[in-house]
């Protein structure tokens, strides 16, 4: 059974039970408040969707060299984001994947809601998982929906840019034009273990494994998102008494 079939079937079943409360539950966390990580970005912690879903094992710390954008390849009609993420947890921890938690560090919903995914991601970088193998050295940001032919909604793109900016600042990643980092792969179907890899600091899943993820429409927007992230990050380089930072011809505002 494919990811889309497994998760979609589970979501359809849950909708029959949740009925009219699905949309409200997707937007209103029951067990915790959103965590404000910047002046413009709040993230719903894992407890808002999975307080009763403990990870199946420990989460190892990660050495973050780049950020990786994914999509769930599920329906773009997502009345209950919380339930969708719970269904993804069920799939990722089932015999189909055997991962300890959801693979992704963060999720972004169509309405711009940002969710913590894998346990520990808000507190510090933790190792993620990915279909096709995990080359390592990344934090995974996953868009809820299928963006093979349809571009993500404006609210989703806005929150994604804010999240990528926050993570780039947090992990000291370069965001200037053509910024890259190198690492030795831990093993994926595109980059076997031991292979030296140079990756854009904001990349798409297909750059690391043989997959269509995050969909052609989303992948085609990566350069736009990188260009929007840079000035947000570059603004943080300016300090009182110092000249604005300049890197690769891109000047901090």
Segments (PLM) and residue ranges:
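Basic/polar, cationic surfaces and motifs that engage anionic cell-wall
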Residues: 2, 10-11, 15-20, 27-61, ...
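Active-site acidic/histidine clusters and adjacent loop/turn architecture
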Residues: 61-97
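A short, polar/proline- and glycine-enriched secondary-structure boundary/capping micro-motif
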Residues: 80, 126-129
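Short, conserved, surface-exposed binding loops centered on an aromatic residue
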Residues: 99, 130-134
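Short secondary-structure junction motifs
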Residues: 101-103
